[in-house]
Amino acid sequence: MPKASPRPGWRHEAAQERSQRTEAALARALAELTKERPFENISVADVAKRAGVAVGTVYRRFRDKRAMLHLSDTAFVDDCRRAFDDELSDERMAGLRLEQLARAYIDLMIRKFREHRTAILQVQRNADQRDAAIYAGRAAEFNAHVHGRFRTLLRERRKEITHPDLETALNLAIFFASAAARDAMWRQSLKAYPIQIDDAAFVHELTRAFVAYLQS
């Protein structure tokens, strides 16, 4: 039997500056539209019109409508990575104690998770599952970069960490904080509990829990 043709990529790479500008316009258009209504109620024509391009241009660039959700995902990842690299830079983190470092990381995470909430929920609900490996790979690369940087900063404050198993503690602390932030910001799971708490208070309490675990 002949081998099946490989699945086409989600887009054709934008090699020329004009193509890159077109993709940026489409990304902005999709971001605006997904804030207005669910992705399933958005057509390719809607995105093209908002971006100021022809429908044919979209289909020449992207495999199909759902492939455009990669734009939302890459926008989230790229924005978060830039923010983490800036706000957790050596210059900004110099001299900070463990609690201050943890607060800076958790505050940034909460802000970015809330900022991109609508777009990420649209991706989670509508992404083509045949592209699951692409999304997973993108997330893994991002986590390796950001979590790797954060672990390094935490290790530099080893004297403040009293947990007997440093590496296990670092990884579980990051996991606990990240999972709680995602659940609270994206799923809004705190609504199931009899508590009223704003983002600033949530950052404060999550920071306390993070530091307390590392010092247990």
Where does each model-flagged region fall?
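Helix-turn-helix
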Residues: 25, 33-67, 71
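Hydrophobic alpha-helical connector segments
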Residues: 67, 71, 85-114, 170-173, ...
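Short secondary-structure transition hinges
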Residues: 99-101, 114-148, 196
